[in-house]
Amino acid sequence: MSSKKSPRTLHNGLPRANTHSWRPPTGSASDPDIVLASLPLGTPDYLRVIGAYFAKYNSQHSKKNKGVSFKTMHDRQRMVVSFFRELRHETPYRNLDPRQLANRHIEAMVARWLERRLSTATIHNYLSFLRTFAGWIGKSGMVREPEFYVGADSPHAHRSEVATEDRSWSAMNVDIAAKIAEIARFDSWVGLQLELEAGFGLRGKEARHLKPHGAVVTCDAANPRDAAAFPECRTFLHISAGSKGGRPRDVPIQTQAQQELLDRVMKLVPPGSYVGRPGFTSLQNQAHFYYVIRKFGISKADLGVVSHGLRHQYANDHFEADAGGPSPVRGGTSRPEGNKPARTRVSRVLGHNRERASTGYLGSDAGLPEAANDPAA
C-alpha cells in the first residue's frame, strides 16, 4: 500500500504556501534538512531542493524576526520556481542546482525580463525574492541592487514611488456608485467590501478582514497620532487585520455617509465575524473577491481600473477637499495653501507615517509654485 502524501505538500515536493504553523518533524523523512542532505549537488530534482528551502524558511520575514503573509509566501514560491524552471529550460544553464545560484544566472534572467519589457516594479520585486532565497542558501549579499544588472542609466535602475497619473476610478470615467451597485446585485459581500474601500480608503484585504462590531472607537481611544491629525473627528474606524506590515491605524469617520455605511455593515455582519461570505476561509474570500470584480470588468484590460484604484480615489478626493485644490496627478499646477497639512492627513488616513508616502497617490509637488493669493479675498 502506498503511503499518503502530506496534505501540506504538493506532488512535486513543493510545500503549500498557505500555512505558517506546519513544518515536518525534525528527523522525519520530510524534514527539510534531511531532504537537502539526501539530494547531491547537481540533482535533477531541483523542485525538491526548492521545496525543502521553502518548507524551512518561507514563513519567515527576510530581515525581521516575524512571520509574513500568505500572499508573500505564495508570491515568493511562485517566482522562485518560475525563475529556475525558465533558467533550466530557456538558457544554457540547463542543469543548475538552485544551491549553486550565482550572479551570472541572475544576469541571464534579467536580460530575458528586459526583453519581455517587464515593469521596473516587477524587476525590483523579483530581485528582492531572489535576494531572500540567496540568504536561505547561505549566499547573503550575493544578489546586488537592480542598477548592477540593468545599468546605471537604465530607467529600470531605480523604482519611482511617485505617481505620475491618476489611478482613481473617476479618471477612467467609471461611475463608482453605479458599478459597485451592479456588483452588489450579484454578490452583496463583494459589494460591501468595495464600499468600504471607497468609503474609507481601505486596502482590499483590510475590507475583507474588517470585523465591524467593536471597530468604531472614540478619539480618546484612537491612535494619538491619528487623533491629532483629525482633531475635528470624534470617532474613528480601527483597522488592524489585513493591514500592511500589521500596522494598525484609525481612520476618521468624517461624514454621515461613512456612518450610514458602517451602520448598514453592522446590521449585515454578525458580531465577531468579518466582512466576507460566511463559511468561506480568508483565502476563499480573496479568490472569490477577485473573481467577481473581474467578471464585472474591474481590471486594467477591461475598464482600466483595479480595486486599489478606490484607495487612490479616496486619497485624491480627500486631498482636494482639505487643500482646496487638485493634486498634481489631477492637473494641479501649484501648491494650494493647505498643501502640506493635507498631504500629512492623506498619509495618516492611508496608514503611512511619512508625509512623502502621499506622493504615491497624489504625485510630486516638487517644483510647483505656491498658489497665488486670491486678490479678491
Residue positions per predicted region:
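N-terminal core-binding DNA-recognition domain of tyrosine recombinases/integrases
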Residues: 56-162
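Basic/aromatic DNA-contact patch characteristic of tyrosine site-specific recombinases
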Residues: 1-81, 85
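Short, basic (Lys/Arg/His-rich) helix/loop patches that form interaction surfaces
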Residues: 290-348, 352, 367, 372-376
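Conserved tyrosine-mediated DNA breakage-rejoining catalytic core shared by Y-recombinases
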Residues: 209-261
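Active-site/catalytic core of tyrosine-dependent DNA strand-transfer enzymes
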Residues: 252-321
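DNA breakage-rejoining catalytic core of tyrosine-based enzymes
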Residues: 156-179, 245-256
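The alpha-helix within a helix-turn-helix
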Residues: 197, 208, 347
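Basic, Lys/Arg- and aromatic-enriched nucleic-acid-binding interface segment
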Residues: 174-204, 340
